[in-house]
């Protein structure tokens, strides 16, 4: 059983599998194709979704086998240090790692998994399937959150 507000006092490395999975807000941004500037290391998001992402629910359709089916897919828990730079600034894993609070729309805070979509944070209605994308550079998006 997950303890209430576990994310406020427990580091990522100490979380149970259940707690770790509960941290995911379901935005789907980690499943978008990204481009990295080789000179600066800056990461750019596209609106192009991985072929395994359900574009309505913003969840992986084959979560257990995703790393085998999509070799570029990062297993966050196993590759957290490398993965952090690829995660959006709103991502709970990144926020907790940086000692920050979760946003009010996060399902753990709001109690409702739809708030991430209602707040316009998820890729619902924005992402397109990779099978229809063509050149990734044609689909760059700015997901930055202004404080």
From Swiss-Prot:
The UniProt entry, under InterPro entries, shows: Puta_zinc/iron-chelating_dom, UCP006173
What's a Pfam family this protein contains? CxxCxxCC
Tell me the protein family, please: Belongs to the UPF0260 family.
HAMAP family given in the database record: UPF0260
Name of the protein in question: UPF0260 protein Noc_1358
Which organism does this sequence originate in?
A: Nitrosococcus oceani (strain ATCC 19707 / BCRC 17464 / JCM 30415 / NCIMB 11848 / C-107)
Tell me the lineage of the source organism. Bacteria, Pseudomonadati, Pseudomonadota, Gammaproteobacteria, Chromatiales
